[in-house]
């Protein structure tokens, strides 16, 4: 028979392993938000912390490799031969150019010849409900965050 013991209210120092993981996620997401704020101070606020936390967890689960060459995701799924597509990882808060919706539809006419064929967005991580190549993008004009597919990322040249 196993006995369960509970810690008291406010006694959060009972499990050092889980506290270290929470600290790592918090610091990583904090860094992601601050980095994005430096480049988009008028759009990125601390309200985007949940997006950064999910992105930090996704990176730790898919990119941290132990001495046996396995990521946490490989250990849980017991899938040793899988490989992470590094092309799906981008800088949190980087500029994203989204293809005009009129060009995405089949048989639709495009925008007039001298109008832009894309719009600017801000990358906030992978969409949890779609394929790995679908990103969550914030529209700076409206503030709407939506999943987007036809994208070009500008990872290195902003700032």
Residue ranges of model-derived segments:
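HHCC-type zinc-binding knuckle of retroelement integrases
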Residues: 1-143, 149, 155-156
């Amino acid at each position: 028979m196993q006995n369960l013991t509970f810690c008291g209210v406010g006694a959060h120092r009972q499990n050092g392993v889980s506290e270290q993981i929470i600290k790592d996620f918090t610091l990583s997401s904090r860094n992601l938000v601050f980095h994005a704020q430096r480049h988009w101070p008028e759009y990125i606020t601390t309200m985007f912390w949940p997006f950064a936390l999910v992105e930090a967890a996704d990176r730790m689960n898919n990119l941290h490799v132990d001495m046996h060459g396995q990521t946490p995701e490989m250990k849980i799924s017991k899938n040793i031969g899988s490989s992470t597509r590094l092309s799906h990882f981008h800088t949190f808060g980087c500029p994203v150019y989204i293809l005009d919706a009129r060009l995405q539809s089949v048989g639709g006419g495009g925008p007039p010849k001298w109008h832009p064929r894309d719009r600017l967005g801000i990358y906030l991580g992978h969409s949890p409900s779609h394929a790995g190549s679908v990103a969550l993008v914030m529209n700076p004009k409206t503030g709407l965050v939506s999943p987007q597919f036809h994208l070009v990322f500008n990872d290195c040249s902003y700032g």
